[in-house]
Amino acid sequence: HTQGWIHCHSAATDASGIVKCVMDELIEYFENMKLPGKLRIALACCLNMCGAVHCSDIAILGVHRRPPRIDHANLRKVCEIPNVSASCPTAAIRPATVDGNPSVEVIEERCMFCGNC
């Protein structure tokens, strides 16, 4: 989602609170044009660092610390299992059968906690 100069490309981190805090601190610089040039501020939700944080003047990185929890009973109702598996950049999510129903499992050692799933 995009708000001001700070943006996030996935739902892994809610950028609203971070945007508010950062812009509250920097608003004076933007209002009075105290900066020598354009200032690029970017927010990335995970270590993939989309949002061009690698080439920004100020980069904010959201770090998640826990693997996703799986609701095996409702998984098939809310998503397509092949898409969930394909969304994982490290192949930490793979199809599995739980209690006779199709589901997924997370290999925690491979998970980078990006929230893409």
Segments and roles (model prediction):
Residues 13, 79, 108-112:
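A short glycine-/small-residue-rich loop at the edge of a beta-strand within enzyme catalytic domains
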Residues 64-66, 70, 96-99, 105-106:
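Acidic low-complexity intrinsically disordered segments
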Residues 1-78:
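Small-residue-enriched alpha-helical segments and adjacent helix-cap loops
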Residues 44-45, 105-107:
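Glycine-rich, charged/polar anion/phosphate-binding loops
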Residues 83-103, 110-117:
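Iron-sulfur cluster-binding cysteine motifs and their immediate structural context
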